[in-house]
Amino acid sequence: MPKYYCDYCDKYLTHDSPSVRKSHTVGKQHKLAVQLFYQQFEAEFTQSLIEARLKEYEESKGRLIHQPPMGIIPTPYGQMYQQQQQQQQQQGILPFQGMQPPPHQQQGMVLSPGMPIHKMQPHQFNNNNNPHQQHSFQPPHHQHHPHQQHQQHQQHQHQHQHQQQHNQPTIPGL
């Protein structure tokens, strides 16, 4: 009679029958061996993924030097401005206080062709420091604050209950 070999436990069973295999697979040693096998498999698989990612990173490290982020294409205007700034700094020329960088240019950020240029204005704040001053913005009339809606609903229910109490027919003798 052929013997059954358990790959997880690395041993042969006495003989190959369903009852022997079943009693072996429900045993404590077999369950522990199966758990250990899958833990090792998971660890090896995770390590191989980590090594593959590191290899990809090391290979791409030399290719990605000084590339702008996706969607931002360097333009000649931005490059000329940066070169001009570098030359002025090297010559010791300080830019005039009123000089500003081109619109939307912040620390190497360059607009791609076709991007709209908007001059952003600083937010205007009210300087009179009156905390009780009403703001000019009012929400549309059809929108109500949730608390107001709750109050209106309660008032409606109260009116409805009041009407029901007064509209009940009176029974003589009660």
Swiss-Prot record:
HAMAP family: U1_C. It comes from Dictyostelium discoideum. Belongs to the U1 small nuclear ribonucleoprotein C family. The keyword Transport does not apply. SMART domains: ZnF_U1. The keyword RNA-binding applies. It holds the Pfam family zf-U1. Gene3D superfamilies: Classic Zinc Finger (3.30.160.60). Keywords: Metal-binding, Nucleus, Ribonucleoprotein, RNA-binding, Zinc, Zinc-finger. GO terms for molecular function: mRNA binding; pre-mRNA 5'-splice site binding; U1 snRNA binding; zinc ion binding. A zinc finger (Matrin-type) spans 4-36. This is U1 small nuclear ribonucleoprotein C. Component of the U1 snRNP. The U1 snRNP is composed of the U1 snRNA and the 7 core Sm proteins SNRPB, SNRPD1, SNRPD2, SNRPD3, SNRPE, SNRPF and SNRPG that assemble in a heptameric protein ring on the Sm site of the small nuclear RNA to form the core snRNP, and at least 3 U1 snRNP-specific proteins SNRNP70/U1-70K, SNRPA/U1-A and SNRPC/U1-C. SNRPC/U1-C interacts with U1 snRNA and the 5' splice-site region of the pre-mRNA. Residues 82-109, 122-140, 164-174 have a biased composition (Low complexity). PROSITE patterns: ZF_MATRIN. Residues 82-174 are annotated as: Disordered. One of its GO terms (cellular component) is commitment complex. InterPro entries: Matrin/U1-C_Znf_C2H2, Matrin/U1-like-C_Znf_C2H2, U1-CZ_Znf_C2H2, U1_snRNP-C, Znf_C2H2_sf. PANTHER family: U1 SMALL NUCLEAR RIBONUCLEOPROTEIN C (PTHR31148:SF1). It is found in: Nucleus. GO terms for biological process: mRNA 5'-splice site recognition; spliceosomal snRNP assembly. Residues 141-163 have a biased composition (Basic residues). Component of the spliceosomal U1 snRNP, which is essential for recognition of the pre-mRNA 5' splice-site and the subsequent assembly of the spliceosome. SNRPC/U1-C is directly involved in initial 5' splice-site recognition for both constitutive and regulated alternative splicing. The interaction with the 5' splice-site seems to precede base-pairing between the pre-mRNA and the U1 snRNA. Stimulates commitment or early (E) complex formation by stabilizing the base pairing of the 5' end of the U1 snRNA and the 5' splice-site region.
